Amino acid sequence: MYPAHLLVLLAVCVSLLGAASIPARPLNLYQFGNMIQCANHGRRPTWHYMDYGCYCGKGGSGTPVDELDRCCQIHDDCYGEAEKLPACNYMMSGPYYNTYSYECNEGELTCKDNNDECKAFICNCDRTAAICFARTPYNDANWNIDTKTRC
């Protein structure tokens, strides 16, 4: 084998090893973001909900700081229940990686009937949270808080 071929092979191997260490990005977060935009008619960017209070975003603990944060706590709990379903126990079928079918029609969200049990459950978790976000006031003071002292 030529030295150039070995270098190419080495580069490919290193790239694959690097890619294997990158955590998979949840697939349904994009759908959940679209549901939020549908329910609130695009009034607030989705990223505003990613670091709000004690529960909106990754993880969650303590007492929710307000009603919007409570929406996120309920959503987290709903995903926890989804993970317990036998239909959601397969690799890449849980709430963070499973995509579902839904419709948005003038702010009305509908989970479609063609979803299997796991997808239907996850879709309803996201739908309920998106509707909760849309009807609940947003307090700028609760965005990007110090969760170690406030939660």
Swiss-Prot record:
Cofactor(s), names only, from the UniProt record: Ca(2+)
Gene3D superfamilies: Phospholipase A2 domain (1.20.90.10)
Tissue-wise expression: Expressed by the venom gland.
PROSITE patterns for the chain: PA2_ASP (PS00119), PA2_HIS (PS00118)
Database matches in InterPro entries: PLipase_A2, PLipase_A2_Asp_AS, PLipase_A2_dom, PLipase_A2_dom_sf, PLipase_A2_His_AS
Cellular-component GO terms for this entry: extracellular region
Cofactor: binding details: Binds 1 Ca(2+) ion.
Entry annotation: catalytic residues: H75, D126
GO aspect biological process, one term: arachidonate secretion
Cell compartments where the protein resides: Secreted
Main localization category: secreted
Cleaved signal peptide residues: 1-27
Disulfide bonds: C38-C104, C54-C151, C56-C72, C71-C132, C78-C125, C88-C118, C111-C123
GO molecular function: calcium ion binding; calcium-dependent phospholipase A2 activity; phospholipid binding; signaling receptor binding; toxin activity
Binding site for Ca(2+): Y55, G57, G59, D76
Enzyme Commission numbers on file: 3.1.1.4
Keyword terms of this UniProt record: Calcium, Disulfide bond, Hydrolase, Lipid degradation, Lipid metabolism, Metal-binding, Secreted, Signal, Toxin
Pfam families (alphabetical): Phospholip_A2_1 (PF00068)
Catalytic activity: a 1,2-diacyl-sn-glycero-3-phosphocholine + H2O = a 1-acyl-sn-glycero-3-phosphocholine + a fatty acid + H(+)
Coiled-coil region: none
Keyword check for Ribosomal protein: no
Family in the record: Belongs to the phospholipase A2 family. Group I subfamily. D49 sub-subfamily.
Function of the protein: PLA2 catalyzes the calcium-dependent hydrolysis of the 2-acyl groups in 3-sn-phosphoglycerides.
Protein name: Acidic phospholipase A2 6
Origin species: Tropidechis carinatus
